[in-house]
């Protein structure tokens, strides 16, 4: 059985990935064909991934990981009456992260992989929708949060 892997150069510092056994690690350094990662209790002796022999693997984003990072299942009060659809499908899994002046919604459709990440930041009068098509992995959510200017939230993510 072939498992999904990540090219080292596509990772960023603070991204979460795992080894071939599923052990979670956080990236500390990235090169063209290698990446260093560390895990709790082993900060002084980093693990080396490479694109040839020991490739990093993605960590699937789960409800438990979202809850550990302050996300909650359901809609914000502003969204309770709204109906979400994308391409005619309705969503059955909606996760929200409130950051005071705005909220972040992660929405999964009930009949297909993929979904939508909505940033509603009222403090900057900004509303941003990002659509993803595949199963969302932790490092992909981290990257998306960084692209939206939410570096602290992305870099302090826990698995």
Question: What is each of the regions a protein language model found here?
Answer:
Residues 1-11:
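Mixed-charge, Lys/Arg-rich low-complexity intrinsically disordered regions
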Residues 16, 22-33:
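Short beta-strand-centered aromatic/proline hotspots
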Residues 21-24, 45, 102:
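Short acidic/polar mixed-charge low-complexity motifs
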Residues 28-51:
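Basic/aromatic-rich interaction segments and small domains that mediate binding to polyanionic partners
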Residues 43-72, 127-157:
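Intrinsically disordered, low-complexity, charged/polar segments
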Residues 73-112:
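Amphipathic, interaction-prone secondary-structure segments
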Residues 101-135:
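Intrinsically disordered, low-complexity regulatory segments enriched in Ser/Thr/Pro
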């Amino acid at each position: 059985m072939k498992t999904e892997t990540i090219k080292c150069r596509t990772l960023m510092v603070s991204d979460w990935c795992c080894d071939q056994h599923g052990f979670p690690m956080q990236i500390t350094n990235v090169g063209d064909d290698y990446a260093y990662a560390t895990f709790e209790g082993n900060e002084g002796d980093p693990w080396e991934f490479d694109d040839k022999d020991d490739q990093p693997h993605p960590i699937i984003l789960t409800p438990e990981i979202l809850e550990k990072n302050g996300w909650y299942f359901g809609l914000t009060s502003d969204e309770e009456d709204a109906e979400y659809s994308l391409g005619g499908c309705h969503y059955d899994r909606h996760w929200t992260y409130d950051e005071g002046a705005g909220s972040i919604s992660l929405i999964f459709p009930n009949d297909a992989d993929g979904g939508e990440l909505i940033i509603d930041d009222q403090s900057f009068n900004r509303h941003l929708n990002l659509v993803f098509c595949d199963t969302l992995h932790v490092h992909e959510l981290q990257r998306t949060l960084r692209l939206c200017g939410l570096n602290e939230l992305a870099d302090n993510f826990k698995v």
